[in-house]
Amino acid sequence: NDNWAYHKICTDHYDTSFFSIVNESQYGTYSHCYLTEKTWKAIFNFHPVIIVGAKHSLKYLKERGFDTFGDIFDESYDEIEDGNERLDRILNTVGNFLENNTKTQLVDLRKKILPRLIHNYEHFWGSFRDYVIDDFHTKIKGIK
């Protein structure tokens, strides 16, 4: 089918950048975290993520076995309840990171974190995928 080419994921921007700022669908105050393909695409393209999303988005990833990069980025924004304050902290985090790292430093940092990026990729396609499928089946069985 020729329409499949339309759905191809462009990866050029992942190959030419260091991290992704992911604008998730949920941003306000929610009782649970729901991550979309926006976050998953960054992860399976070997990118650290800064998530502009609901509170505890990074916590959600960590609880499911993914590595986040609190040693590189200030991830305290993930704990902030107020959406405006959280966005301000994210902007400061990105600004500080960009101001304090040269291209040469980013190349070195990329090499240093590559094993963690590979872990996230393999985890996404491995045990996490199985978790999602099992969770889906459990929810389907619960529908009456």
Stretch-by-stretch model annotation:
Residues 1-22, 28-36, 40-144:
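Pol beta-like nucleotidyltransferase catalytic core
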